[in-house]
């Protein structure tokens, strides 16, 4: 999902092919375990370089299942959430999934990052296991099989949404794109943005790229600025975004910046003395923390109380993914796999990241929050659909 993720996952896969170990197990019971519990599996990187994402997503799922158990569980039984650590490695993830099968799971909430999720989906296809990823944005995930769903939007979906926003809300006529050519996430957003922008009659005056390890973007920015775009799309993650926006402002760029959910957290890495570099920036995200929605605010409060930290979009999506699976099982009236998959396909769920139904590819149909950054603060610029 993330640029950083893509790099470490590639390294982890190489290591896994040469010396694959048994995944460390973390079994979490979301409430009092007893005979006759409904066992739902979870997969996430709980250790390793991408553990920050796995911990957040799995914490969100834990909170959801604990709330459900406190309210009586589902189908008259408590949920036993069995969570395994796959360390961000596709081979480890498949091994962990096999362990979950041995433990008798009836559904799976996971995985978190895209490469392990695709690997597990290929294996889960054989079992018709009801499976939902909270945060795997690679479009290929849900194309694997009819039993695979996702709670988040896709990379191309974000690009299309931001192109529509730029055309309809910002009324721009000329935009540029600067993206990471070595990252699927960045490339997926960039390509979809370009296609959608041009379809809206917006000129894409420059389409520039850079490598994963680059930290000097002045050559590309100079080329971009020579054509005077009104906005620049930066479909990358907040550490890189902070570098690019600073260099662009230093070169005299005064237009808008656009981005995807990888921007979430950029205010935490830009020094207050330079915070104005982010003025007139807009990025897509799964929710806006200051949205007055009652369910969202309840989640934010409960999560902070339980885990002593502020939730991020990974946590929110983990929560929604768990609740989606539980609702599908409840609607199915049993843990029969085919019945649960059928119920999920027809679900209508009111979540904290939006009201969710699924399209024919089992991707969520929901609105996306576009966040504006001005004066070092975030505000909701719009809620946008594709």
Task: Briefly describe each language-model feature range.
Residues 93, 151-174, 187-189, 216-218, ...:
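Hydrophobic alpha-helical segments within soluble ligand-binding/sensing domains
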Residues 189-284:
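Extracellular/periplasmic bilobed ligand-binding domains
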Residues 305-315, 326-377:
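Segments of small-molecule ligand-sensing domains
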């Amino acid at each position: 999902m993330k640029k950083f993720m893509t790099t470490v996952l590639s390294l982890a896969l190489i290591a896994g092919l040469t010396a694959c170990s048994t995944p460390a197990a973390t079994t979490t019971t979301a409430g009092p375990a007893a005979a006759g519990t409904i066992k739902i599996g979870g997969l996430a990187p709980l250790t390793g370089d991408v553990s920050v994402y796995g911990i957040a997503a799995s914490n969100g799922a834990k909170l959801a299942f604990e709330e459900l158990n406190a309210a009586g569980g589902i189908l008259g039984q408590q949920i036993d959430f069995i969570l395994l650590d796959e360390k961000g490695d596709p081979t480890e993830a498949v091994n962990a999934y096999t362990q979950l099968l041995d433990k008798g799971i009836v559904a799976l909430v996971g995985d978190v990052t895209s490469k392990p999720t695709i690997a597990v989906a290929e294996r889960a296809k054989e079992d018709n296991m009801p499976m939902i990823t909270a945060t795997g944005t690679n479009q290929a995930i849900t194309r694997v099989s009819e039993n695979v769903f996702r709670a988040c939007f896709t990379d191309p979906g974000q690009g299309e949404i931001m192109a529509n926003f730029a055309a309809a809300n910002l009324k721009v006529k000329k935009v540029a794109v600067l993206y990471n050519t070595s990252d699927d996430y960045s490339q997926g957003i960039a390509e979809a943005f370009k296609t959608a922008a041009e379809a809206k009659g917006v000129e894409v005056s420059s389409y520039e790229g850079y490598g994963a390890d680059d930290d000097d973007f002045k050559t590309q920015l100079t080329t971009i600025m020579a054509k005077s775009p009104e906005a620049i799309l930066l479909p990358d993650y907040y550490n890189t975004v902070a570098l690019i926006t600073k260099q662009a402002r230093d070169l005299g760029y005064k237009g808008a910046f656009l981005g995807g959910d990888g921007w979430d957290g950029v205010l935490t890495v830009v020094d207050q003395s330079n915070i104005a570099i982010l003025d007139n920036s807009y990025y897509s995200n799964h929710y806006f923390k200051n949205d007055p929605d009652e369910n969202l605010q309840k989640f934010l409060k409960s999560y902070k109380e339980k885990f002593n930290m502020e939730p991020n979009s990974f946590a929110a999506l983990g929560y929604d993914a768990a609740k989606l699976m539980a609702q599908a099982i409840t609607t199915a009236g049993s843990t029969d796999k085919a019945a649960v998959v059928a119920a999920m396909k027809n679900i209508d769920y009111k979540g904290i990241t939006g009201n969710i139904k699924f399209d024919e590819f089992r991707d969520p149909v929901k609105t996306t929050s576009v966040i504006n950054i001005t004066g070092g603060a975030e505000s909701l610029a719009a809620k946008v659909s594709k």
